[in-house]
């Protein structure tokens, strides 16, 4: 039976960054990308990365995140993620991500819904694609194996300890077992169940729930505000942050 230190299920920036971190720590990971290599959820519509680049601290960013997320927000996680924003952005720049710039050389920051300050940085509508490419390069440099021929079906549990996964091998048509010491679910969200697959089909949530793992924070489900009806096309939210306007056929503003 195939065996790994770590199985990472997902194909977007979160999965790729987890693989890079695992490899750097001396762990041997494998990426299970059932949607196909390069088909990560954030490839097209990632608007940018929020970072407190013009603020003394990340406390206001943390507070905005908690307010937007509601009472179920994990405050400790919000503080950690917001606090790491500037460092993560600098790391991606060192690895080759070319950000939009403003006069003076600092990254351009847009103000978007949910933020009290301009924080959204990135590469315009190429942010998702470029971020994924940079992380793919880093994963390749570390020799991370990426499997696009498998689709995760279930987690294999031994009490409260995960022992691996069962997966459908699309090349052979067989169901196979893969052992691992740990599994990271880095899939897209599940809001696409209501709004379209481009916003996440809920694979990670489904795998966890089916294995008896308690889910939390599901009361508030984010939805992409600029999804074109009847399609899986998401328009980058940075369109609004850069001064764009959404109007009804009457000319009345819907958002700006």
Short names for language-model regions:
Residues 1-63, 101-103, 123-256:
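Residues forming the flavin
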Residues 67, 71, 75-82, 121-129, ...:
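Hydrophobic alpha-helical scaffolding
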Residues 69-108, 112:
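Rossmann-like flavin
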Residues 91-97, 118-123, 237-239:
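Short, charged low-complexity intrinsically disordered segments located at boundaries
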